Regions:
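N-linked glycosylation sequons
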Residues: 71-93, 108-110, 120-366
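Structured segments of extracytoplasmic/periplasmic soluble domains
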Residues: 59-63, 91-103, 142, 173
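Alpha-helical assembly-interface signal, strongest on the long, hydrophobic N-terminal helix that forms
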Residues: 2-94, 201
């Protein structure tokens, strides 16, 4: 009998210990569940704030691109955004005002959380505030004590945590032109990436488009995406460009390949001269981007070539730049002299490397 009561006592003792352990485990599980639910809600809210910050930064930077579209390179270089700062910030605020995050609508973004500046991927840090020729906008969207109030917790308040701060940042910038629409490349020549890599400063530097194949003429003639890549076909394209019967194809950096002729284009020189004579007097802002009837300013592609030798292959286009053809000298020199210009804006998407020409349609960079 004594052993029986002793056994019952031990069982009751074990039950008590088990109850304590179960109670502790339930508390721990409840804690994990509480934090899991609240962390999940916080992440959903952060995603919503991120979308708001992204949209606000893109909208404001796009307005910056629109402003630049009406300017010459010299005006872009001297542009001070102070006069447009209120407009740029209001555009970002309007995007947020039409959005909600964490169940709250009409999100407010403070002036201090919208910063106009410059983005340079090679710099550290890459974004710096400035109103002098800016190319980027940085936006912070908040649910905290500074703006819109923190989000409320569900179960974490059991542990004394009643609210949580959530923020999201985004930077949108005008970057190197990444696309050229149909007809946007009226000159069937490109510049090797080697020309840019070999120069500490390439802005306003001279380059020859004829003859090519050396450091001074680090360029190549092409027939766009046509075949064959012959001087005869190049002549036909030059003639059709001059008469308005041909338009260059839509070109996307990193995707499109052009067929380069290899430098044997002497028979096409007179056709090059004829195209120059037609284009230099257009001054239409499209085919000829200047107002000087003695020069021809146009966008040309940059092709992926390791040196300045004459290219003879289907070669990927990796970006775009703007050139001014200043003179085409006939016999006896047979020379086409040009220079690369910087601080140009094209109504096109960015996303490409920087070769002196930006796209006015921004992208998210951070």
């Amino acid at each position: 009998m004594r052993n029986h009561f002793l056994t019952l006592y031990k069982l009751r003792d074990r039950d008590g210990v088990t109850a304590i352990v179960v109670g502790i485990m339930l508390a721990i599980l409840l804690g994990f569940a509480a934090f899991a639910i609240d962390i999940g809600y916080s992440r959903v809210t952060k995603n919503e704030l991120q979308n708001i910050a992204d949209g606000a930064a893109l909208a404001s930077a796009r307005q910056l691109g629109v402003i630049y579209e009406t300017m010459s390179p010299s005006e872009i270089r001297s542009y001070d955004a102070s006069a447009d700062e209120v407009t740029l910030k209001d555009i970002a605020k309007d995007v947020a005002d039409q959005s909600k995050a964490g169940g709250k609508g009409n999100i407010i973004i403070n002036d201090d959380d919208i910063v106009i500046g410059s983005w340079d991927a090679s710099a550290s840090p890459p974004f710096s505030p400035t109103v002098s020729s800016p190319n980027a906008v940085q936006v912070t969207a908040r649910r905290d004590s500074i703006s819109n109030g923190p989000i409320s917790t569900f179960f974490a308040r059991i542990f004394g945590i009643n609210t949580s701060d959530v923020t999201a940042d985004a930077t949108a910038a005008l970057t190197g032109q990444g696309t050229a629409e149909e007809g946007g490349l009226p000159l069937p020549v490109g510049i090797s990436r080697a020309w840019f890599l070999n120069k500490e400063e390439f802005c306003d530097q001279p380059i020859k488009f004829y003859p090519t194949g050396d450091s001074e003429g680090c360029a190549g003639w092409n027939v766009y995406t046509e075949t064959p890549s012959s001087a005869s076909n190049l002549r036909d394209i030059l003639d059709d460009l001059a008469s308005g019967d041909y338009e260059s194809p839509e070109t996307i950096a990193g995707k499109t390949e052009f067929d380069f002729t290899g430098g044997n284009v002497a028979t096409a020189f007179s056709d090059m001269k004829a195209l120059f004579d037609v284009m230099k007097i257009k001054n239409d802002g499209i085919l000829d981007k200047d107002d000087d009837s003695n020069t021809w300013t146009a966008t040309v592609p940059v092709y992926d070539w390791a040196d300045c030798s004459n290219p003879n292959d289907d070669i990927p286009i990796i970006g775009f730049t703007t050139v001014v053809i200043e003179e085409v000298l006939e016999s006896p020199t047979h020379t086409i002299n040009a220079r690369v210009t910087c601080d140009n804006i094209e109504t096109a998407r960015g996303g490409g490397p920087s070769y002196g020409t930006w796209g006015s349609i921004p992208g998210l960079v951070e």
